Amino acid sequence: MSATLADDSVFVSALGLNTEDMKNIITPENANDIGDRLIIFPKYVNSDISEIEIKEKIEKIAEKYNVVILVPSFSRAKFWDERGIRTATKDNIDKIVAALKSGKHVGKIIFVNRYDGIDLPGDACRMLVIDGLPPLNSIKDRYIQSVAPQSTVLLREQVQRIEQGMGRGIRSNDDECCIVLMGDELTDVLSRNRGIDYFSVATRCQYDLSKQLWD
């Protein structure tokens, strides 16, 4: 729930709490259940790098480690897995998750759109790729997107969805995972629209530390 509640204004909009209620929300003093994440943003580092080049580097890493790739659609999944043999579906997702958690080398696996509730700790996922902007699922968010695409409310929701995806590969404070962010729409939200400013404190700290390594 940490990513879901990073923006506590949801308590006002969804639960109808007032200002006094907001002052009494129980908040942890730290987020020491979050492991180490190296966050890589290839297009931010080098705007000339192509998606094919990024893909080739990631697939090389997948020869040794388990790499999970989150995409917004099955059409985008084909970029990574043209034959569809490494893409999770409703029919095989439980089997794939079990294989990843077994500790064995599985390699590259693609999850499409819905991945809430999927936890991939340790060797189950050593690199997690978010390729593209996660879709907004609620009717309210889709309405806001249609009438006010530059809305701050919408931007916060989009960043929240990105953070939820980032959390799939790291589940405890002694876990570690490399996060790769890619895709034009995702780049627009995080970079051009300053979505990075809406990361939770812990994620922003890890992002800033990672950025020092690429700069």
Language-model segments: which ranges?
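Generic beta-sheet signal
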Residues: 1, 65-69, 106-109, 179
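Interdomain hinge/linker at the junction between the two RecA-like core domains of SF2 helicases
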Residues: 4-60
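Conserved strand-helix element at the start of the C-terminal RecA-like helicase core
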Residues: 5, 61-83
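Short secondary-structure boundary/capping segments
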Residues: 11-20, 83-88, 124-128, 142-148, ...
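Conserved RecA-like helicase motor-core motifs
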Residues: 20-26, 82-97
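Conserved RecA-like P-loop NTPase helicase motor core
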Residues: 44-45, 99-188
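Long, largely alpha-helical accessory region at the distal end of helicase-like NTP-driven motors
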Residues: 66, 75-76, 172-215
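Conserved helicase motor
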Residues: 71-75, 87-100, 111-116
